[in-house]
């Protein structure tokens, strides 16, 4: 199979894979090298859905931010949705060891104490407590979920 340079670049710009790491006593977390290459040094960590944290590269955060800005301020759900993601959002930087310092409120929100899973999710990274990851990502009902995705237009 022949791949084009554009396709190779696109693959490099996606976050994929599952990595197990630990948060140290100071709240620092090592970011896998594959993720660091794409994050560079401009990224945002915020509350995510399902009790995890979302990590957006700067450019993806800007796209998300524009979508949030487009929501009507007169809609209460839109305000709550925006508040959920933006109020706790924190710009982060990698230190020389490739770690980030996760603010305590975000660690508490996601229940991050020691063992964590970093999951690449195409345009973002999710940071989960290992326990929540295991609870939320069982494959027991994947056939049902696949059927629902088909209803949304995603067919495998």
Region locations from a protein language model:
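Flexible "stalk/tail and boundary" regions
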Residues: 1-21, 25, 35-92, 96, ...
